[in-house]
Swiss-Prot record:
<comment type="function">
    <text>Responsible for synthesis of pseudouridine from uracil-55 in the psi GC loop of transfer RNAs.</text>
</comment>
<dbReference type="InterPro" id="IPR014780">
    <property type="entry name" value="tRNA_psdUridine_synth_TruB"/>
</dbReference>
<comment type="similarity">
    <text>Belongs to the pseudouridine synthase TruB family. Type 1 subfamily.</text>
</comment>
<dbReference type="InterPro" id="IPR032819">
    <property type="entry name" value="TruB_C"/>
</dbReference>
<dbReference type="GO" id="GO:1990481">
    <property type="term" value="P:mRNA pseudouridine synthesis"/>
</dbReference>
<dbReference type="GO" id="GO:0031119">
    <property type="term" value="P:tRNA pseudouridine synthesis"/>
</dbReference>
<dbReference type="Pfam" id="PF16198">
    <property type="entry name" value="TruB_C_2"/>
</dbReference>
<feature type="active site" description="Nucleophile">
    <location>
        <position position="38"/>
    </location>
</feature>
<dbReference type="Pfam" id="PF01509">
    <property type="entry name" value="TruB_N"/>
</dbReference>
<keyword id="KW-0413">Isomerase</keyword>
<keyword id="KW-0819">tRNA processing</keyword>
<dbReference type="GO" id="GO:0003723">
    <property type="term" value="F:RNA binding"/>
</dbReference>
<dbReference type="InterPro" id="IPR002501">
    <property type="entry name" value="PsdUridine_synth_N"/>
</dbReference>
<dbReference type="GO" id="GO:0160148">
    <property type="term" value="F:tRNA pseudouridine(55) synthase activity"/>
</dbReference>
<dbReference type="InterPro" id="IPR020103">
    <property type="entry name" value="PsdUridine_synth_cat_dom_sf"/>
</dbReference>
<protein>
    <recommendedName>
        <fullName>tRNA pseudouridine synthase B</fullName>
        <ecNumber>5.4.99.25</ecNumber>
    </recommendedName>
</protein>
Length: 289
């Protein structure tokens, strides 16, 4: 059993809990997910099984889409409603001011991750330090907000949809919006509705998966990587590529763009893996036979 499951994680369990349940259903130990969702959050959680674990890093690079709600006028230590209240403020902002603050985060920026996060500093996770009562300076990291739109406002609650790059913390985004409005904000609800090619509409609820039906929902490895274009190679190229050879002879190569990742297939449509051509030739970057 090899491939990817587009699982819909319910509220109240960890992403690791999802992996454990899939292990019990399949009896397979080699399983991993492609991006943590906190227990408070629900939504799309692609789970890689067997050889599918080889593409975890590639799937994690994909954009994410979230529906999130924040509450104005409150700040907590975790930046979400499960944390300890640090401050409560009056909310005296207009709808236009809220819209302007939210839209100001569109594009490239730097974001400081929350203390309650799984990032490591000197070998220790930030949330472990936070639980010890320690707060350390965190380096701001580059993120991209590709799109952000307000869905509903019922002050003090604001619901919005955001399409963002890997590594974006929605809790921090809510906190930063609140800071911009000078009244504070805390994330109240979070749903991941898309992770790259994996959407909420095409997901399967965790409690509906069984030993009998799980195969019906497994997506093949090459299909899960459909953000990369297909490229076909001759049988001669196939043998060389599979053995780790970089092919520099242009007479043997398909017409491929330089420094662009492709899904490489044999003449008989067998998926070989991910490959890239540079100035020296074509080579398989990740063999997935």
């Amino acid at each position: 059993m090899n491939g990817i499951l587009n699982v819909y994680k319910p509220i109240g369990i960890t992403s690791f809990d999802v992996v454990c349940q899939i292990k019990k259903i399949t009896g397979i130990k080699k399983i991993g997910h492609t991006g943590t969702l906190d227990p408070l959050a629900c939504g799309v959680l692609p789970v890689c099984i067997g050889k599918g674990t080889k593409v975890v890093d590639y799937l994690m690079k994909d954009f994410k889409v979230y529906d999130a709600t924040f509450k104005l006028g409150i700040i907590t230590d975790t930046y979400d409603r499960e944390g300890k209240e640090l401050s409560i403020s009056e909310v005296n902002v207009s709808l236009d001011e809220i819209e302007c603050a939210v839209n100001s985060f569109l594009g490239d920026s730097f974001q400081v991750p929350p203390m309650y996060s799984a990032l490591k500093v000197n070998g220790k996770r930030l949330y472990e330090l936070a639980r010890e009562g320690k707060s350390i300076e965190r380096e701001a990291r580059p993120i991209t907000i590709y799109d952000i739109n307000i869905l509903h406002i019922d002050i003090p609650y604001v619901k919005f949809r955001v399409k963002c790059s890997k590594g974006t913390y929605i809790r921090s985004l809510c906190y930063d919006i609140g800071s911009n409005l000078k009244c504070g904000a805390t994330m109240w609800d979070l749903e991941r509705v898309q992770s790259g090619a994996f959407t909420k509409e095409n997901s399967i609820e965790l409690n509906k998966l069984t030993t009998d039906n799980i195969n019906d929902y497994i997506i093949s490895i090459d299909e899960s990587l459909n953000q990369y274009d297909k490229a076909f190679v001759s049988s001669k190229c196939e043998k060389l590529l599979v053995n780790g050879v970089r092919i520099g002879d242009k007479r043997l190569l398909p017409n491929l763009d330089i420094n662009k990742m492709y899904r490489i297939y044999s003449e008989d449509n067998k998926f070989l893996g991910l490959g890239m051509r540079n100035s020296k030739g074509l080579k398989i970057e990740k063999l997935l036979l």
